[in-house]
A protein has these predicted regions:
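N-terminal domain-onset segments
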Residues: 1-71
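Low-complexity intrinsically disordered segments
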Residues: 1-3, 74-182
Length: 182
């Protein structure tokens, strides 16, 4: 086995979505450290068991929204009640002078390997490890775990699950134009 991983042991015995995310992230780290990259994959779960696994390959940024809409339709069709998304991503601090600048375009961006688990019931879990590149050498920093947060990518899933808008979404700063300010 290329990665030293037993596929039968990739998922958590507990069947809990957060435990699945942690277990899958350990595997993703091994794959990344072996290959120097990780493809974007999503696993849909029902009652703690994986029922759908797919690679997502957006051609451009706008395709991500369409892919998540299709994923939500599939989740609804097969009765998925949770999802784990594993991917590489860019992150950057907000720039008040350029509020619409994407992280990939920021000079202050960092690259991360991430896993985000969401479910019909319960809070999301986000795992991340900073990608450290030195020429051809690549390694990952320690894993950081965060429960909660505003993971807008999953809005289409929340919609089909009829999940209330998370409170974390209301706590975000409002736009610089005053819209939404009281």
């Amino acid at each position: 086995e290329r990665y030293g991983v037993d596929p039968a042991k990739m998922y958590a015995d507990s069947g809990k979505v957060h435990d699945h995310a942690r277990s899958l992230f350990v595997v993703a780290r091994k794959m990344f450290e072996k290959d120097g990259y990780h493809i974007t994959v999503v696993i849909l779960l029902r009652d703690g068991k994986p029922i759908d696994f797919r690679e997502l390959r957006p051609g451009e940024h706008g395709h991500k929204f369409l892919m998540m809409r299709r994923l939500a339709q599939q989740a609804q069709k097969i009765g998925a009640d949770a999802a784990v998304l594993l991917s590489e991503t860019w992150s950057a601090p907000a720039n008040p002078a350029k509020p619409y600048m994407r992280a990939v375009d920021s000079p202050d961006r960092i690259e991360l390997l991430t896993a985000t688990a969401v479910s019909k019931d319960g809070d999301p879990l986000h795992l991340s490890a900073k990608i450290l590149r030195d020429g051809k050498n690549v390694r990952l920093a320690d894993t950081i775990e965060h429960v909660g947060g505003a993971h807008f990518t999953f809005a289409p899933l929340y919609e089909v699950w009829e999940k209330p808008i998370p409170k974390d979404w209301d706590q975000l700063p409002k736009g610089t134009d005053g819209v939404g300010e009281e």
